[in-house]
Protein backbone atom coordinates (compact mmCIF):
# COMPACT_ATOMS: atom_id res chain seq x y z
CA UNK A 1 0.00 0.00 0.00
CA UNK A 2 2.76 2.44 0.90
CA UNK A 3 4.64 1.57 -2.27
CA UNK A 4 1.50 2.14 -4.33
CA UNK A 5 0.90 5.56 -2.78
CA UNK A 6 4.56 6.52 -3.28
CA UNK A 7 4.43 5.41 -6.92
CA UNK A 8 1.20 7.35 -7.48
CA UNK A 9 2.72 10.46 -5.93
CA UNK A 10 5.82 10.22 -8.13
CA UNK A 11 3.70 9.76 -11.25
CA UNK A 12 1.50 12.77 -10.32
CA UNK A 13 4.57 14.93 -9.60
CA UNK A 14 6.15 14.00 -12.92
CA UNK A 15 2.90 14.80 -14.71
CA UNK A 16 2.66 18.23 -13.14
CA UNK A 17 6.32 19.00 -13.87
CA UNK A 18 5.90 17.82 -17.43
CA UNK A 19 2.77 19.90 -17.84
CA UNK A 20 4.65 22.99 -16.73
CA UNK A 21 7.58 22.43 -19.05
CA UNK A 22 5.72 20.92 -22.03
CA UNK A 23 3.68 23.21 -24.28
CA UNK A 24 -0.08 22.55 -24.56
CA UNK A 25 -1.23 20.93 -27.83
CA UNK A 26 -4.64 20.98 -29.46
CA UNK A 27 -5.60 19.12 -32.66
CA UNK A 28 -8.36 20.59 -34.84
CA UNK A 29 -9.19 18.91 -38.19
CA UNK A 30 -5.73 17.43 -38.33
CA UNK A 31 -3.99 20.74 -37.52
CA UNK A 32 -1.90 20.73 -34.35
CA UNK A 33 -1.87 23.98 -32.35
CA UNK A 34 0.91 24.41 -29.78
CA UNK A 35 0.71 26.90 -26.92
CA UNK A 36 3.92 27.84 -25.12
CA UNK A 37 3.57 27.80 -21.32
CA UNK A 38 6.75 29.68 -20.61
CA UNK A 39 6.21 32.68 -18.31
CA UNK A 40 6.21 36.09 -20.01
CA UNK A 41 9.12 38.24 -18.93
CA UNK A 42 8.03 41.78 -18.14
CA UNK A 43 10.26 44.75 -18.76
CA UNK A 44 11.55 46.00 -15.42
CA UNK A 45 10.41 49.43 -14.34
CA UNK A 46 12.85 52.26 -14.58
CA UNK A 47 14.43 52.88 -11.23
CA UNK A 48 15.36 56.20 -9.71
CA UNK A 49 19.03 55.95 -10.68
CA UNK A 50 18.14 55.01 -14.26
CA UNK A 51 15.79 58.02 -14.55
CA UNK A 52 18.55 60.30 -13.30
CA UNK A 53 20.87 59.02 -16.04
CA UNK A 54 18.28 59.52 -18.77
CA UNK A 55 19.76 61.61 -21.56
CA UNK A 56 18.06 64.57 -23.21
CA UNK A 57 18.46 66.30 -26.54
CA UNK A 58 20.61 69.42 -26.50
CA UNK A 59 19.66 72.78 -28.01
CA UNK A 60 21.72 75.93 -28.41
CA UNK A 61 18.91 78.05 -26.91
CA UNK A 62 16.57 76.74 -24.21
CA UNK A 63 13.65 78.75 -22.81
CA UNK A 64 11.78 78.38 -19.52
CA UNK A 65 8.54 80.13 -18.58
CA UNK A 66 6.97 80.95 -15.24
CA UNK A 67 9.61 79.91 -12.73
CA UNK A 68 8.88 81.06 -9.17
CA UNK A 69 11.31 81.71 -6.30
CA UNK A 70 10.14 81.46 -2.70
CA UNK A 71 12.51 82.58 0.03
CA UNK A 72 13.58 85.12 2.62
CA UNK A 73 14.28 88.86 2.35
CA UNK A 74 16.50 90.80 4.72
CA UNK A 75 19.27 93.38 4.79
CA UNK A 76 22.63 94.09 6.36
CA UNK A 77 22.33 97.25 8.47
CA UNK A 78 25.42 99.42 8.26
CA UNK A 79 23.70 102.68 9.22
CA UNK A 80 25.52 105.22 11.40
CA UNK A 81 22.43 106.15 13.41
CA UNK A 82 24.21 108.88 15.34
CA UNK A 83 25.05 110.66 12.10
CA UNK A 84 23.22 113.65 10.66
CA UNK A 85 21.93 111.80 7.57
CA UNK A 86 20.23 109.01 9.55
CA UNK A 87 18.68 111.44 12.05
CA UNK A 88 17.36 113.62 9.23
CA UNK A 89 15.68 110.63 7.59
CA UNK A 90 14.45 108.96 10.80
CA UNK A 91 14.68 111.36 13.79
CA UNK A 92 15.52 109.58 17.03
CA UNK A 93 16.27 106.29 15.28
CA UNK A 94 18.73 103.67 16.48
CA UNK A 95 19.80 100.15 15.45
CA UNK A 96 16.69 98.61 17.09
CA UNK A 97 14.13 100.54 15.03
CA UNK A 98 14.42 98.46 11.87
CA UNK A 99 14.84 95.01 13.40
CA UNK A 100 12.96 92.55 11.19
CA UNK A 101 10.93 89.43 11.89
CA UNK A 102 13.33 87.12 10.13
CA UNK A 103 11.07 84.26 9.03
CA UNK A 104 8.22 86.60 8.11
CA UNK A 105 10.32 88.81 5.84
CA UNK A 106 9.74 87.07 2.54
CA UNK A 107 10.94 87.21 -1.03
CA UNK A 108 8.98 86.01 -4.05
CA UNK A 109 10.38 86.25 -7.57
CA UNK A 110 8.28 85.50 -10.64
CA UNK A 111 10.49 84.86 -13.67
CA UNK A 112 8.33 85.55 -16.69
CA UNK A 113 10.92 84.11 -19.07
CA UNK A 114 14.52 82.92 -18.83
CA UNK A 115 16.82 81.69 -21.58
CA UNK A 116 20.12 79.86 -21.74
CA UNK A 117 22.44 80.26 -24.73
CA UNK A 118 25.15 77.70 -25.44
CA UNK A 119 28.67 79.19 -25.52
CA UNK A 120 31.04 76.21 -25.23
CA UNK A 121 29.83 72.61 -25.71
CA UNK A 122 26.75 73.23 -23.52
CA UNK A 123 29.10 73.29 -20.54
CA UNK A 124 29.45 77.08 -20.47
CA UNK A 125 26.25 79.02 -21.18
CA UNK A 126 24.93 82.57 -21.02
CA UNK A 127 21.81 82.83 -18.87
CA UNK A 128 19.43 85.82 -18.90
CA UNK A 129 15.76 86.62 -18.34
CA UNK A 130 13.02 88.97 -17.19
CA UNK A 131 11.08 88.84 -13.95
CA UNK A 132 9.42 90.54 -10.99
CA UNK A 133 11.26 90.67 -7.66
CA UNK A 134 8.95 91.15 -4.67
CA UNK A 135 10.51 91.91 -1.26
CA UNK A 136 8.70 92.23 2.07
CA UNK A 137 10.49 93.43 5.20
CA UNK A 138 8.44 92.79 8.36
CA UNK A 139 9.41 95.05 11.27
CA UNK A 140 9.18 94.15 14.95
CA UNK A 141 8.72 97.78 15.98
CA UNK A 142 5.91 100.24 15.02
CA UNK A 143 7.94 102.37 12.58
CA UNK A 144 5.84 104.38 10.12
CA UNK A 145 6.88 105.60 6.66
CA UNK A 146 5.44 109.00 5.75
CA UNK A 147 4.37 109.01 2.08
CA UNK A 148 4.21 112.83 1.84
CA UNK A 149 6.89 114.49 3.97
CA UNK A 150 7.07 118.28 4.26
CA UNK A 151 8.23 119.82 0.98
CA UNK A 152 9.70 122.97 2.53
CA UNK A 153 12.55 120.99 4.10
CA UNK A 154 15.61 120.03 2.06
CA UNK A 155 15.86 116.54 3.59
CA UNK A 156 12.48 115.95 5.26
CA UNK A 157 12.00 113.11 7.78
CA UNK A 158 10.43 110.01 6.29
CA UNK A 159 10.33 107.45 9.12
CA UNK A 160 9.02 107.92 12.67
CA UNK A 161 8.26 105.68 15.62
CA UNK A 162 4.54 105.39 16.34
CA UNK A 163 3.96 105.99 20.04
CA UNK A 164 0.15 106.29 19.99
CA UNK A 165 -1.16 105.15 23.43
CA UNK A 166 -3.08 101.88 23.37
CA UNK A 167 -2.33 101.07 19.71
CA UNK A 168 -1.01 97.61 18.93
CA UNK A 169 0.38 96.33 15.64
CA UNK A 170 -0.54 93.06 13.99
CA UNK A 171 1.52 93.72 10.87
CA UNK A 172 4.04 96.32 9.81
CA UNK A 173 6.03 95.82 6.62
CA UNK A 174 7.85 97.68 3.88
CA UNK A 175 7.32 96.19 0.41
CA UNK A 176 9.71 96.99 -2.44
CA UNK A 177 8.98 95.52 -5.88
CA UNK A 178 11.34 95.57 -8.85
CA UNK A 179 11.38 94.65 -12.53
CA UNK A 180 14.59 92.63 -12.74
CA UNK A 181 16.88 91.42 -15.51
CA UNK A 182 19.57 88.88 -14.51
CA UNK A 183 22.68 88.13 -16.57
CA UNK A 184 24.76 85.13 -15.54
CA UNK A 185 27.34 82.62 -16.68
CA UNK A 186 26.02 79.08 -16.32
CA UNK A 187 28.26 76.04 -15.79
CA UNK A 188 26.40 72.83 -16.60
CA UNK A 189 28.47 69.83 -15.47
CA UNK A 190 25.98 67.27 -16.84
CA UNK A 191 24.57 68.92 -20.00
CA UNK A 192 23.05 65.77 -21.51
CA UNK A 193 21.28 64.55 -18.37
CA UNK A 194 17.60 65.07 -17.62
CA UNK A 195 18.37 66.05 -14.00
CA UNK A 196 21.46 68.28 -14.17
CA UNK A 197 24.15 69.59 -11.86
CA UNK A 198 24.52 73.33 -12.61
CA UNK A 199 26.06 76.44 -11.11
CA UNK A 200 25.26 80.00 -12.25
CA UNK A 201 26.69 83.35 -11.14
CA UNK A 202 26.39 86.93 -12.35
CA UNK A 203 24.59 90.21 -11.72
CA UNK A 204 21.04 91.56 -11.98
CA UNK A 205 19.61 95.00 -12.67
CA UNK A 206 16.32 95.92 -11.00
CA UNK A 207 14.08 98.96 -11.33
CA UNK A 208 11.71 99.91 -8.50
CA UNK A 209 8.15 100.08 -9.84
CA UNK A 210 6.21 99.98 -6.54
CA UNK A 211 6.81 100.48 -2.81
CA UNK A 212 4.43 100.67 0.16
CA UNK A 213 4.27 100.58 3.93
CA UNK A 214 1.45 98.28 5.01
CA UNK A 215 0.22 98.29 8.61
CA UNK A 216 -2.57 96.52 10.48
CA UNK A 217 -3.30 98.06 13.88
CA UNK A 218 -5.88 97.61 16.63
CA UNK A 219 -7.66 100.91 15.98
CA UNK A 220 -6.89 101.84 12.34
CA UNK A 221 -7.25 98.41 10.77
CA UNK A 222 -5.43 97.90 7.48
CA UNK A 223 -3.59 100.87 5.95
CA UNK A 224 -1.32 101.16 2.92
CA UNK A 225 0.96 104.15 2.39
CA UNK A 226 2.25 104.12 -1.20
CA UNK A 227 5.38 106.08 -2.10
CA UNK A 228 9.01 105.50 -3.03
CA UNK A 229 10.12 106.68 0.48
CA UNK A 230 13.37 107.84 -1.15
CA UNK A 231 14.38 104.31 -2.01
CA UNK A 232 16.99 104.08 -4.75
CA UNK A 233 15.06 103.37 -7.99
CA UNK A 234 17.89 101.11 -9.23
CA UNK A 235 18.99 97.91 -7.58
CA UNK A 236 22.19 96.18 -8.71
CA UNK A 237 22.87 92.79 -7.17
CA UNK A 238 25.20 89.82 -7.30
CA UNK A 239 23.06 86.76 -8.11
CA UNK A 240 23.63 83.03 -8.25
CA UNK A 241 21.88 79.67 -8.21
CA UNK A 242 22.78 76.02 -7.72
CA UNK A 243 20.82 73.17 -9.32
CA UNK A 244 21.03 69.59 -8.04
CA UNK A 245 18.57 67.45 -10.00
CA UNK A 246 15.11 68.94 -9.52
CA UNK A 247 16.18 71.21 -6.64
CA UNK A 248 17.44 74.75 -7.36
CA UNK A 249 18.67 77.10 -4.64
CA UNK A 250 19.11 80.82 -5.37
CA UNK A 251 20.56 83.87 -3.70
CA UNK A 252 21.26 87.57 -4.27
CA UNK A 253 23.19 90.34 -2.53
CA UNK A 254 22.90 94.01 -3.53
CA UNK A 255 25.87 96.20 -4.37
CA UNK A 256 24.80 98.95 -1.95
CA UNK A 257 21.99 100.32 0.25
CA UNK A 258 18.44 100.32 -1.09
CA UNK A 259 17.94 103.90 0.21
CA UNK A 260 19.17 107.02 -1.54
CA UNK A 261 19.90 108.71 1.80
CA UNK A 262 19.73 108.26 5.54
CA UNK A 263 19.80 104.49 5.97
CA UNK A 264 22.47 102.02 4.92
CA UNK A 265 20.45 98.83 4.42
CA UNK A 266 22.02 96.42 1.90
CA UNK A 267 19.37 93.84 0.92
CA UNK A 268 19.85 90.14 0.25
CA UNK A 269 17.56 87.23 -0.67
CA UNK A 270 17.83 83.44 -0.68
CA UNK A 271 15.47 80.51 -1.11
CA UNK A 272 14.31 77.71 -3.41
CA UNK A 273 13.22 77.85 -7.05
CA UNK A 274 10.16 76.05 -8.41
CA UNK A 275 10.14 75.01 -12.07
CA UNK A 276 6.80 74.23 -13.74
CA UNK A 277 8.65 72.08 -16.28
CA UNK A 278 9.79 69.70 -13.51
CA UNK A 279 6.24 69.49 -12.12
CA UNK A 280 4.62 68.65 -15.46
CA UNK A 281 7.31 66.14 -16.35
CA UNK A 282 6.54 64.24 -13.12
CA UNK A 283 2.84 64.18 -14.01
CA UNK A 284 3.58 62.79 -17.48
CA UNK A 285 5.84 60.12 -16.06
What do the PLM-derived regions correspond to, one by one?
Residues 1-23, 276:
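Bacterial Sec-dependent N-terminal signal peptides
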Residues 17-62, 280-285:
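Sec-dependent signal peptide cleavage junction
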Residues 54-62, 77-79, 117-124, 190-196, ...:
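Short loop/turn motifs that connect adjacent beta-strands in outer-membrane beta-barrel proteins
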Residues 56, 68, 110-116, 130-132, ...:
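Residues on the lipid-exposed face of transmembrane beta-strands in outer-membrane beta-barrel proteins
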Residues 60-66, 122-128, 175-179, 193-199, ...:
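Outer-envelope beta-barrel architecture signal
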Residues 72-78, 116, 132-138, 203-211, ...:
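Transmembrane beta-strands of outer-membrane beta-barrel pores
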Residues 79-85, 93-104, 137-176, 208-218, ...:
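Extracellular/periplasm-exposed beta-strand and loop segments of Gram-negative cell-envelope proteins
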Residues 228-285:
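Predominantly the C-terminal beta-signal and adjacent terminal strand-loop region
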